[in-house]
Amino acid sequence: MAAAWSWRASHSTITMTSGSLVVLFLLLSIWQPAVQVEGRRQMANSQEMIKDHLGARSQNKTPAITNNANQSSTSSADLDDGAADDDDNKADLPVNVSSKPYWRNPKKMSFLQTRPSGSLLTLNCHALGNPEPNITWYRNGTVDWTRGYGSLKRNRWTLTMEDLVPGDCGNYTCKVCNSLGCIRHDTQVIVSDRVNHKPILMTGPLNLTLVVNSTGSMHCKYLSDLTSKKAWIFVPCHGMTNCSNNRSIIAEDKDQLDFVNVRMEQEGWYTCVESNSLGQSNSTAYLRVVRSLHVLEAGVASGSLHSTSFVYIFVFGGLIFIFMTTLFVFYAIRKMKHEKVLKQRIETVHQWTKKVIIFKPEGGGDSSGSMDTMIMPVVRIQKQRTTVLQNGNEPAPFNEYEFPLDSNWELPRSHLVLGATLGEGAFGRVVMAEVNNAIVAVKMVKEGHTDDDIASLVREMEVMKIIGRHINIINLLGCCSQNGPLYVIVEYAPHGNLKDFLYKNRPFGRDQDRDSSQPPPSPPAHVITEKDLIKFAHQIARGMDYLASRRCIHRDLAARNVLVSDDYVLKIADFGLARDIQSTDYYRKNTNGRLPIKWMAPESLQEKFYDSKSDVWSYGILLWEIMTYGQQPYPTIMSAEELYTYLMSGQRMEKPAKCSMNIYILMRQCWHFNADDRPPFTEIVEYMDKLLQTKEDYLDVDIANLDTPPSTSDEEEDETDNLQKWCNY
């Protein structure tokens, strides 16, 4: 070996010293015997393992390939009680023989159930016994438990939960008892958020070598929130490269592929394929079938030779690495003085930043899609560590969040000049600004915000991108997301929200609620006629019709969420907010006395269900606000329960004073208790077009001494019986 190495060294292009050759000779002399001994030991161990494996499987003579996707599971309590010793024998017991409880089919009982949110889960604990046992369900060790959201159904042996949410996660235990004993089974339930994606590979099949007539298996597990289809595809081969063109599907909807009494013709490639509506994923492994142990021994010996070659390559590479390291150290020494000066001036600062990741829906903004509602973008925030260099005493720049760059909407911060604050809430505020000599509004978060507040602002921005532009909605103009806080730039409405605008410009005679000690208000800046009010309602209907065509549900349509722009163009705002109905307290009274429940449809009050028809109900309430110059609907109702009882009884708000019957008819159509009876926004727009095109002269509205009782009188009931006749005027 030393001679061989000396010959290679003499022909090498690298000049080495005699000391290096001596060190290399010693390393090889020590390493080679160790490798040979290790190779023989691994070969012997492989032989023993294969013999033991064959001995354990020699008694199993069943068909060549079987498939089993569900492994049998028996709880520890079953084993303690002896209930799982012989399930088949117990199933054959006579009816009059006393027996403590035992599981009817323990192989179908699993210890772990993973489901996406919004799906249905059924836990089954079917047991037998004499006398007939009873069952008790526990969640996290508690017997008296309920769900915070969704229905819960307990049948004889099953527990069913619909519309799963992350709050349903936990340990569920079924305890079955009779007078002779008890058994129990635990199931861990995990509910994960839905993510639209093609199947994601979790565990793929591994290459497998089996001796003829032995047994083995391959495993394949994918994660998919959508309905998926799985299949195993087989390609026969004689060696990994000499393969047939014939492909066949040998199993479907199985996570595990079992090989029992394997034959030579079963050698080949096995591919696990799973697909859903968004695509497919696959993973492939090779099954090698050998006739005897000698083939495996030859493979082990060949592997030993490859290991020896690897040692030579490793040592040679190590010498090159040492040589390059020496050159690097020499270069570093020459630069040491310069580096020392730089270290005195530059300090490395490690910071933790948060990366904002946006999962955009595929086809979520397509109005021609088959979905009833628009798919909201998913926003995730992940922590990551970054390194920043600080020069001298100047503080290092720090950005708490890292946002993805969208070049189609990004604006330079230097073009943005912030001005006065227009309004602010608990965690966000809106500021007037100027961009390229144009007045805009900028949305941002306040100090003390949380990650959820950032995610909500990002989600609102992404929804506005998906929806697009329309004259009667607040449109997105751009954003500033790089090298600083997130600014969402939208259109500016100089006249504020519609509710305040109507109240400021209400006609004289609507001051009965004003304190007599206060001076009379100044005349309105703009005299609003009934035709102006109808134009306002028409613009809002057009904006809502556009949002409905984009599969967007507003959920909070009210005069306070409609802004008045230049030339009294109305624009619907806050349609991009992703509201969590379960976590938002819609029943709590705000400090200004407004109750958002008064704009909600009956199905939203009772079932938290929202769709375009629930927005139509809210539009009817908004229409009433317009015709009363921003008055509060249902002034005497102060709770959700009272409002729902009021609506269930068939009562509705009366027609505002001097409001035309045509407009009130539209209100009543929007307030149908059955959502299917409410007109869509497309028909509302057509109805408004007819009203505006009529030759009838509209009088200026002068609503003096207006009284809005909470119920509908009998006289108005006679008028509403002829709604269809008025609609076809």
Curated annotation (Swiss-Prot):
One of its GO terms (biological process) is positive regulation of innate immune response. The chain crosses the membrane at residues 310-330. Residues 416-692 form the Protein kinase domain. The active site is at D556. Keywords: ATP-binding, Developmental protein, Disulfide bond, Glycoprotein, Immunoglobulin domain, Kinase, Membrane, Nucleotide-binding, Phosphoprotein, Receptor, Repeat, Signal, Transferase, Transmembrane, Transmembrane helix, Tyrosine-protein kinase. Residues 106-192, 203-279 form the Ig-like C2-type domain. Disulfide bonds join C125-C174, C220-C272. The modification Phosphotyrosine is found at Y587. Glycans are attached at N70, N96, N134, N140, N171, N207, N213, N242, N246, N282. Its main location: membrane. ATP binds at L422, G423, E424, G425, A426, F427, G428, R429, V430, K443. Residues 78-89 have a biased composition (Acidic residues). It is found in: Membrane. Gene3D superfamilies: Immunoglobulins (2.60.40.10), Phosphorylase Kinase, domain 1 (3.30.200.20), Transferase(Phosphotransferase) domain 1 (1.10.510.10). Residues 37-309 are extracellular. It is a single-pass type I membrane protein. Its EC number is 2.7.10.1. Residues 331-729 are cytoplasmic. May be required for patterning of muscle precursor cells. May be essential for generation of mesodermal and endodermal layers, invaginations of various types of cells and CNS formation. Belongs to the protein kinase superfamily. Tyr protein kinase family. Fibroblast growth factor receptor subfamily. This is Fibroblast growth factor receptor homolog 1. It comes from Drosophila melanogaster.
